[in-house]
């Protein structure tokens, strides 16, 4: 799509973050809200929002960078999918050197505490937060 303004602006992700496993969240009707929330809570940088051609109020695809990694999301569901329950069985882990700053910013933006940010038996400071979309985030500050 050479005429796409998001691509024409040069607002493309660093190829280094486009490797490995990339989480892709389906947030039925809430992807734009999540996109903005992740900028406030986790300092996310935007690499593009692409509306659904049939329903321009919904995002077909959105892409951000958080802490050097890529996160993708959509408002759309495949026709065979039903509305998803709160995500379970995984979390998104942020490994950082300044855990207190990440923790404070996420709480101020609206995350709730699942586990407090404390020193763990393996030596790291670690926590678990839940964002308003039901996604659990762990902040890990490795022991020095």
Language model: regions and residue ranges:
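GST-like domain detector, emphasizing the conserved glutathione-binding G-site
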Residues: 84-88
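A structural signal for short, well-ordered beta-strand segments
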Residues: 23-25, 90-94
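Vicinal oxygen chelate
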Residues: 1-19, 51, 60, 65, ...
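Core segments of cupin and vicinal oxygen chelate
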Residues: 15-17, 25-71
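Short beta-strand-to-loop junctions in surface cap/lid or active-site-entrance loops
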Residues: 29, 76-77
């Amino acid at each position: 799509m050479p005429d796409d303004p998001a691509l024409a602006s040069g607002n493309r992700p660093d190829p280094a973050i486009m490797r490995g496993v990339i989480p892709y969240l389906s947030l039925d009707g809430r992807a734009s809200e999540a996109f903005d929330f992740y900028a406030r809570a986790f300092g996310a940088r935007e690499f593009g929002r692409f509306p659904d051609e049939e329903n321009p109020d919904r995002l077909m695809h959105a892409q951000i960078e958080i802490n050097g990694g890529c996160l993708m999301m959509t408002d759309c569901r495949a026709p065979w999918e039903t509305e998803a329950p709160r995500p379970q069985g995984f979390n998104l882990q942020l490994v950082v050197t300044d855990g207190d700053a990440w923790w404070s910013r996420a709480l101020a933006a609206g995350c709730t505490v699942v586990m407090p940010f404390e020193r763990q038996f393996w030596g790291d400071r670690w926590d678990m937060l839940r964002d308003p979309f039901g996604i659990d985030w762990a902040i890990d500050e490795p022991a020095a």
